[in-house]
Swiss-Prot record:
Protein family: Belongs to the UPF0178 family.
Source organism of this protein record: Caulobacter sp. (strain K31)
Residue ranges of the TM segments: none
Disulfide bond sites: none
Coiled-coil zones: none
Signal peptide, first to last residue: none
Protein name: UPF0178 protein Caul_3070
Length: 151
């Protein structure tokens, strides 16, 4: 059965994920390093991990596998999920694939290098209604595809 995992710290589309999870009856883990409000339903479980780099990512990566969908903007986590056979979807609806993850990792490393040299890089653009709509469509598509995966 498909499971959804939300890398929930700073995730702007949690409510959208809850709606899709309810529509398909999917177990959903909301993973963060602090308490956040989640719907009171047995299908949605909040996991609070210790604060620290990559602890939430590790929790998700150790569990996600074929047929699961992970919602994250963390490119290294997306890479780990793909290597485990799962699907990784960014909050803007960007589906990470084995064909695109390498360039995403490279772009991330270049940005980190530029920032370490004192270069000012632009952050992400403001998140708006069109982004939410694109995300919902992409999540629905990812869930339909993931449900076809044989575990």
């Amino acid at each position: 059965m498909t499971v959804l995992y939300i890398d929930a710290d700073a995730c702007p589309v949690k409510d959208e994920v809850y709606k899709v999870a309810a529509r398909y009856g999917l177990k959903t883990f909301v993973v963060s390093n602090s308490w956040i409000r989640v719907p009171l339903t047995p299908a949605i479980e909040q996991i609070v991990v210790d604060a620290g780099p990559d602890i939430a990512d590790d929790w998700i990566a150790e569990r996600a596998g074929p047929g699961d969908v992970v919602i994250t903007n963390d490119i290294p986590l997306a890479d780990r999920v793909l290597k485990a056979g799962g699907a990784a979807l960014g909050t803007t609806g960007r589906l990470f694939t084995v064909d695109t993850i390498g360039s995403a990792l490279a772009s991330r490393m270049i940005g980190e290098h530029l920032r370490s040299m004192g270069e000012i890089t632009s952050g992400p653009k403001a998140f708006g209604p069109a982004d939410r709509s694109k995300f919902l469509q992409a999540l629905d598509t990812a869930v339909v595809k993931a449900r076809r995966v044989v575990r």
